[in-house]
Swiss-Prot record:
Protein name as annotated: Uncharacterized RNA methyltransferase PMT_0737
GO biological process entries: rRNA base methylation
Keywords, comma-separated and alphabetical: 4Fe-4S, Iron, Iron-sulfur, Metal-binding, Methyltransferase, S-adenosyl-L-methionine, Transferase
Annotated [4Fe-4S] cluster binding sites: C83, C89, C92, C171
Pfam families registered for this protein in UniProt: tRNA_U5-meth_tr (PF05958)
Domain TRAM: residue ranges: 12-70
Upper taxonomic lineage: Bacteria, Bacillati, Cyanobacteriota, Cyanophyceae, Synechococcales
Top EC group: transferase
Similarity annotation: Belongs to the class I-like SAM-binding methyltransferase superfamily. RNA M5U methyltransferase family.
Organism: Prochlorococcus marinus (strain MIT 9313)
Residue ranges of coiled coil: none
InterPro entries: MeTrfase_TrmA_AS, MeTrfase_TrmA_CS, NA-bd_OB-fold, SAM-dependent_MTases_sf, TRAM_dom, U5_MeTrfase_fam
Active site: C418 (nucleophile)
Length: 465
């Protein structure tokens, strides 16, 4: 091993070499980024502006992974993580950064990405955040399960960069109404002795525990995700939970036999109570099932819908609002409640079924939902005078969707993105000089405090043909 002084190192470091570095930024996983002799160095638990002695661990392509040996200088934005297992758990990556520090970091990252990938130098509004809800904001948990060869059940999220489970009995980012069940359910699952393996590497059995809560109604839905229905005493255990906790409205078993990155399967079996819970969202009553996609941060989702409705308020009620990638109607239904006629487009049939059910539940007859390939449906339904709302998955817009927008040129477009990189790519094609639109506003939203994720709403207006 070489000495700890930089002068004794060759231009290409070796594992075990030690140097002093200063952190320049964080990567998308929350790891510190630094440079040494033109090499990118990745080291955990280091914030921008902090310096430390690090030890090189291994080379990965044109980067070096390193571990922090000793902190030399810290920044004022560092804080003790609210969670005692934050340094090990892969669920949250920046709990050690203050709430204000997280806001500044995310604002800067969004600006860098839009400028680098989209050549977009537009004003970005202050991040829509709520420091009072930086913890306890998640309305849903999907927690891996594993029983080892000694029969001990492990329940928790994965250790950073591995499939090893870090046990937990509470999680600070989960709604406290979820937290209260974790320890008791874990104890009961331990006693039941059912096999459990989240990634099916050792056979069939339980894979995940799911808990969903209506943050306004406090109703709870508990789900066991399993690769098999052969779990002795399952119904009795479900009935016992149902009678033990009045807030629990349903217990379900979701079957997921596939070894992929999808936690939930398509088949859900009712064990006790009801298949759905009620949640109040933007003055509407919504039914949510085990597999319903619903924003995990209810209050922030309401705030972004409010922003959209405010933006729409100057539009004539005679136009159509086309909501592409509408899901269960989280955006469509509140807009319809203001009087606009809304057409929702969605690929997944189950989501459309729930959207129609929720429209009927709220007596909204000015909204309709169509199931199919969104790019094909949009080409058939979009008109020039319409307002288009886009809420695509992380991969962004299909090229056919962009071609349809550029061909028909609806008057206004709202694009809610969960990935700034694909947002930058898509906006570059829609904005002058490549397209007919100008940006009215870029509004970032922090749906996931304590993580590196940032979402952004782009509001566009047609200015040329």
């Amino acid at each position: 091993m070489t000495s700890s002084t930089d002068s004794n190192l060759t231009l290409i470091p070796s594992p075990g070499d030690k140097v002093e570095i200063t952190c320049l930024d964080l990567d998308r996983h929350g790891n510190g980024l630094a440079r040494w002799n033109n090499w990118v160095v990745i080291v955990n638990d280091l914030l921008p502006g902090e310096s430390a002695q690090i030890e090189f661990v291994r080379r990965h392509r044109n980067q070096f992974l390193a571990r922090k040996v000793q902190t030399i200088e810290t920044v004022a934005s560092r804080r003790p993580p609210p969670c005692k297992i934050a340094k090990e758990c892969g669920g949250c990556s920046i709990q050690h950064l203050s709430d204000h520090g997280q806001t500044l970091l995310k604002q800067g990252h969004l600006r860098q990405i839009l400028l680098r990938l989209g050549q977009l130098d537009h004003k970005i509004e202050p991040i829509m955040t709520d420091y009072n809800r930086a913890l306890g904001y998640r309305n849903r948990a999907l927690i891996p399960l594993y029983r080892n060869s000694e029969g001990q059940l492990h329940m928790g999220y994965y250790r950073r960069g591995s499939h090893q489970i870090i046990d937990l009995n509470r999680c600070p980012v989960l709604d406290r109404g979820i937290d209260q069940y974790l320890a008791s359910i874990k104890d009961d699952l331990q006693q039941q002795n059912w096999p459990a393996d989240s990634d099916l590497s050792s056979g069939e059995g339980l894979r995940h525990l799911g808990i969903r809560i209506g943050q306004k109604t406090k109703q709870v839905l508990i789900t066991l995700v399993s690769s098999t229905t052969q779990l002795s005493g399952l119904h009795q255990q479900a009935k016992e939970w149902y009678s033990r906790w009045p807030e629990v409205r349903g217990i379900t078993l979701n079957i997921q036999r596939q070894r992929n990155n999808l936690v939930l399967g398509q088949e859900t079996i009712l064990l006790a109570g009801d298949l759905e819970i009620e949640e109040h969202f933007y003055n509407l009553s919504l039914l949510l099932s085990t597999t319903t996609f619903f924003q995990v941060n209810t209050l922030q989702a309401e705030r972004i819908v409010s922003k959209l409705i405010e933006w729409l308020s100057t539009a004539s009620l005679d136009i159509n609002i086309i909501d592409a990638y509408c899901g269960i109607g989280t955006i469509s239904l509140p807009i319809a409640a203001t009087g606009y006629h809304v057409i929702g487009l969605e690929l997944h049939a189950e989501a459309i079924t729930q959207a129609n059910k929720n429209a009927l539940r709220n007596s909204l007859d000015n909204v309709s939902f169509l199931c199919g390939d969104v790019s094909l449906l949009l080409a058939k339904k979009l008109q020039r005078n319409d307002v288009l709302v886009l809420d695509p998955p992380r991969k962004g817009l299909d090229q056919m969707v962009i071609k349809t927008i550029l061909s028909i040129q609806p008057e206004r477009v709202a694009y809610l993105s969960c990935d700034p990189a694909t947002l930058a790519r898509d906006l570059k094609q829609l904005i002058v000089p490549n397209g007919p639109y100008q940006i009215d506003e870029l509004q970032p939203i922090d749906f996931f405090p304590q993580t590196m994720h940032i979402e952004c709403l782009a509001l566009l207006t047609r200015i040329s043909s």
